[in-house]
A protein has these predicted regions:
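Conserved NTP-binding catalytic cores of kinases and kinase-like/nucleotidyltransferase enzymes
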Residues: 2-105, 229, 341-343
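A cross-family kinase active-site recognition segment
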Residues: 131-189, 211-213, 312-316
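ATP/Mg2+ or Mg2+-diphosphate-binding catalytic cores
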Residues: 16, 20, 180-181, 298-343
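Active-site activation/catalytic loop segments of kinase-like enzymes and analogous catalytic loops
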Residues: 245-276, 292-308
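Activation segment
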Residues: 75, 127, 232, 240-242, ...
Length: 343
């Protein structure tokens, strides 16, 4: 019988004790409300946990004012300087009337601390998921992403990471292999297939050549875009980093190759109203998808002692989970050798 992965054995290895000692176990409703009082936000006692795993995010109701959203940052993930760089980038976008949700300032500060937790407060913005199958929606998103990138190209991040093969591919792969996350009978298979996949990523980066990099949203998928009758607004710049422009475009595309090419044409039609796009970056689309797949598995593994993760990802670490990841990477190896998407 194949051995279970680390996630599958967690309960028998003192998992519950680790959960109880996780820093977020101390983030009680009282701590949240007390923290907000320190920056002049007086809640009426009602909190709604919103769908965030990396951080803890709450909608907070107030007696006589509209609700706000409070984000409590994951301890030890970002330095203060990195968070403030994110805030400054979003503020610069907002100043140019680009539809983003910037943190509120209290006495000139957007990053606050209480009881060992750093947090920021945002205005609440409603909206629905964008309809990415509609050409006009894709063009609209393309126009605003070009404006975000135009601002992103003006300056550089000094304290936030670069999207590269080492940090998004090699390091996550090494973590999974070195920390006993793979079932014994799949470990060598995953090691071989993931190595092949990252070799394919390197070849794709070589084909793209010396592409430009800039400050990005970094995680621009449909869940981080809220749509209203007035159009989109972009939320959650928590993964903002330096990288190629196409990183903020490819996650808006879905379906088979023909559907992705059609979607790309609509995105670029809007994008190029405001900014040129380097077509060499299209060599990176499947390479970036491959890096995201490897990174995502390690992201879950590294946070498994956070009680939100086993609850949200109960299938993580099972035999079937790793078999599916191996199959995905094999498919990516083939896709990375195909010609880039046509525009």
């Amino acid at each position: 019988m194949p051995s279970l992965s680390r996630a599958g054995r967690s309960k028998s290895r003192g998992y519950n004790a680790r959960v109880e000692s996780h820093p977020y176990a101390r983030l009680t409703p009282d701590v949240v409300l007390d923290a907000l009082e320190t920056v002049g936000v007086r809640g009426d006692g009602r909190l709604l946990a919103l769908g965030s795993y990396e951080n803890r995010v709450y909608q907070v109701w107030r007696d006589d004012e509209p609700p706000v959203v409070a984000k409590f940052y994951r301890p030890e993930r970002w330095s203060d300087a990195a968070i403030l760089e994110e805030h400054a980038f979003v503020a610069a976008l907002a100043e140019r009337e680009i539809p983003v949700v910037a943190p509120l300032s209290h006495h000139g500060r957007s990053l606050h601390e209480h009881a060992g937790f750093r947090f920021a407060v945002y205005p609440r913005r409603g909206g629905r998921a964008p309809e990415l199958d509609r050409p006009q929606v894709l063009e609209w998103l393309g126009r605003f992403l070009a404006r975000i990138h135009a601002v992103g190209a003006v300056d550089r991040f000094a304290h936030r990471p670069v999207l590269d093969i080492g940090s998004f591919g090699d390091a996550p792969r090494a973590y999974l292999l070195e920390h006993d996350w793979l079932p014994a009978d799949l470990r060598e298979v995953y090691a071989g297939v993931s190595a092949q996949a990252l070799d394919g990523v390197r070849r794709a980066f070589e084909r793209a050549g010396a592409f430009a990099t800039l400050r990005l949203h970094g995680d621009c998928h449909a869940g981080n875009v809220l749509w209203t009758d007035d159009g989109p607004h972009f939320v959650d710049f928590d993964d903002a980093r330096t990288g190629p422009a196409v990183q903020d475009l490819w996650m808006l595309l879905s379906g088979d190759r023909a559907a992705m090419e059609a979607g790309l044409r609509h995105v670029l039609r809007g994008y190029e109203d405001f900014r040129d796009f380097d077509p060499r970056e299209l060599h990176l689309v499947e390479a970036l998808r491959t890096l995201r797949l490897v990174h995502y598995a390690a992201w879950i593994a590294e946070r498994w002692d956070d009680p939100a993760f086993p609850a949200a990802f109960p299938w993580f670490g099972t035999q079937r989970y790793w078999q599916d990841r191996i199959l995905e990477l094999r498919e990516q190896i083939a896709l990375m050798d195909e010609p880039p998407l046509a525009t």
